[in-house]
Amino acid sequence: MENKIIKFLAHNGKVLVKCIDSTKIVEDARKIHDLSPTATAALGRLLTMTSLMGSDLKEEEDSITVQIKGDGKLGILTAVTDSKGNVKGYVTNPRVDLPLNDIGKIDVGGAVGKNGMMYIIKDIGLKDPYVGMTPIVSGEIAEDFTEYFAKSEQTPSVVALGVLVDKNGVKTAGGYQISLMPDATEEEISKIEEAVKNSDSISKMLDDKLSLEEIAKKVTGDENIKVIDKNISPEYKCDCSRAVSYTHLRAHETRRHL
């Protein structure tokens, strides 16, 4: 089992697609932190998207920290990534487990909470780190990242994240981000909307053994996608204690308020 990130261009370069299979990352996190199924799904989604963001960093020492502070029982969720997409994370209450929601799915939104903030801290070698923040939209995490990209980075995107958990652990985990390039038109937007609507969930597509390239074709409606980066194999890497990570985050927050 290998974690993998592959990036594509679709619709003649007007659409950027980044796909990730993070199954091993999430399973490693589950084992290390003894996560409940609910915590596995929530932290797993956050780790998946944070890793995908890290893969865009330019310099080796760059990093991104994402923290979600909702009013749900899980407490605070934190993930940190480097420029290779390697990621680590933790949740305040890792054993919290909620009943399935009304549609029979793990209730990530209920566990994270629908009130609160998401913080993105990018440390890219400048005097001060960049700090972006947006209110939590649903607590389902993918929708919250979609809001962040639209509001803080002015990048219209579709974000999908999924973690499939069974009695043995993490069966599949992964995600994708579809971003419109500046020259994208209403035609490309309509094609993407239609393709995403007609696609299965990311966790089901991975469970059905679709490759990341097949997934990218499905969610863009473009059979002629172009691979632009396929040499990214991120891992779950825990290289510091939770206390050190909290100190690092507090330092960023202090500078943000100065």
State where each predicted segment sits:
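Local cysteine-cluster metal-coordination motifs and their immediate loop/turn environment
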Residues: P234-Y246
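Conserved small/polar residues in nucleotide/adenosyl-binding loops
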Residues: T247-T254
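Broad hydrophobic/π-residue packing in well-ordered secondary structure
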Residues: Y148-F149, Y236, H252
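Interaction interfaces in information-processing and related assembly proteins
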Residues: M1-D229
